[in-house]
């Protein structure tokens, strides 16, 4: 029975992590590729410390 609880707990933690990850603003996209990358998300492109940051319009 404890294995079942462990599996359910792992599934819940995985679900929370997968929900949070896409919301991260800084992504590993170079500044040259930033405008087209953010355009696919309908967001404004901005470069900070040589990293692409997509901000809401």
Curated annotation (Swiss-Prot):
Keyword terms of this UniProt record: Disulfide bond, Ion channel impairing toxin, Potassium channel impairing toxin, Secreted, Signal, Toxin, Voltage-gated potassium channel impairing toxin
MF terms in GO: ion channel inhibitor activity; potassium channel regulator activity; toxin activity
Protein name per its UniProtKB record: Potassium channel toxin alpha-KTx 8.7
Pfam families: Toxin_6
Main subcellular location: secreted
A single cellular component GO annotation: extracellular region
Biological role: Inhibits voltage-gated potassium channel rKv1.1/KCNA1 at nanomolar ranges (IC(50)=8.5 nM).
Family that this chain belongs to: Belongs to the short scorpion toxin superfamily. Potassium channel inhibitor family. Alpha-KTx 08 subfamily.
Top-level taxon of the source organism: Eukaryota
